[in-house]
Structures are given as C-alpha cells and as structure tokens.
Design a protein with these regions (language model features):
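Class I Rossmann-like S-adenosyl-L-methionine
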Residues: 1-210
Length: 210
C-alpha cells in the first residue's frame, strides 16, 4: 500500500522537518565547515535512528493508516539502517533492493503461503495431540501459524533440509512471538520430525537430504 497523495499527508513531513531542524544532530552538522561523503552518510544515519524512527507521532500515524504496519516497523527500520550503513561512496549508483532476492525466492514465498492456507486444517491436526496441557484454541495464534508453516515446509518442500526449516521457524518465533514460544515450538517440531520420519511421511530429495 502506497501513500499516493503526499499533499494530504504533508503535516507529518513538516513535523519531521521541524524535529530535524530542532535536533542537536542537525545543528552540529550545519556548523561543520567541511564535509565528506562519510560525514553526510553518518549524519543521515544518526538523523534516522535518533529523530525519525523514534518519532511517536509518525508511529501513531502509520498505525492509524494501516494497523498491520506496526509489526513491520522494526523490520523496516533495521533494513533502512543496514542500507544506509552499506553506502560506500557518493558516486555509486545505489538502488533500493527488490522485495524478493530473485524469481525463485518469490515463487517459494507464494507457494508456501498457498499450501499453508489450503492445508491448514491438516497441519493443525498434526500438533493438536502434541500439546496435552494446552487446548489448541489457547495456543497463541502466531505460534499456530508458525507451526503450520513449518509443517508445510517439512512435508511439501522436499528440497529444503530439515535442519534449515527448524532453525528458520525457531528464529521466527524468537523474533515475533512470545518469550517462551521458541521453546514450545521447538519441542513440538522435534517430536513431529521424529514421527514423520518413522512413518515415512516426510520425503526429502536432493539438497533436502543434507
């Protein structure tokens, strides 16, 4: 979703401009008698991390505009910092990286989403009896989504190694879910992998055998 009519949102641009001008970072930068690409880059980086990213009014605006953006803000901020830090010289032709690494990456994401959604009841059934102390309805919604995606990858993506899948979804749990979610998810997936291997339900080929 893009903001197409900036004239309707210029109050927030002016707000950030005002915050920038009032910041010590900006004032110190403007007092410098000499400059360089490295100094300019560091100024922009400091300005973003100290003035723009923490701005509560901007955060509230983005939250009101689209609620789901709130979960993405930390990831986007980290991405921006990495991109600014990576800039090396003023004459380089810098381009904003694509959403997907390549066509294969895009196809994988789309296939994972479609297969997880179409088979979610089947995947939920695999771990419903692995949580004797928990009613499935009481498991955090994000944990159930992570589990379904992991099971989908284990069973429907034969070329992806088991270890890669386990590590990937444990990291997702640590990053986005509750503090104890990674332990909970690790226990369930570990038992499921053993079960899938025992009944030969999980078939890996090629790189997936690693």
């Amino acid at each position: 979703r893009k903001i197409n009519q900036w004239i309707l949102n210029d109050d927030y641009i002016l707000l950030l401009l005002s915050a920038t001008k009032e910041s010590t970072i900006y004032q110190n930068y403007m007092e410098q008698t000499t400059t360089s690409f490295a100094a300019d880059r560091d100024f922009i980086l400091d300005l973003f991390t100290e003035v723009i990213a923490p701005n509560e009014k901007l955060y509230d605006y983005l939250e009101d505009l689209k609620l789901t953006w709130v979960d993405d803000i930390p990831v986007v901020n980290t991405f921006i910092v990495k991109q600014l830090t990576a800039l090396q010289s003023a004459d380089q032709k810098w381009k904003l990286p694509k959403v997907y690494k390549d066509q294969e990456d895009q196809e994988y994401a789309q296939e994972l989403f479609i297969k997880t959604v179409l088979n979610e009841k089947e995947f939920a059934g695999y771990f419903s009896d692995k949580t004797p102390n928990w009613d499935v309805d009481r498991i955090a919604e994000l944990d159930t989504i992570i589990l379904k995606m992991a099971i989908c990858e284990l069973l429907r993506f034969p070329s992806i190694p088991i270890k890669v899948t386990l590590n990937e979804y444990l990291e997702l749990a640590k990053e986005y879910s509750t503090p104890k979610s990674s332990i909970f998810i690790n226990g369930i997936l570990d038992n499921l992998v053993k079960e899938f291997q025992a009944n030969k339900k999980m078939q890996k080929i090629g790189r997936g055998l690693l």
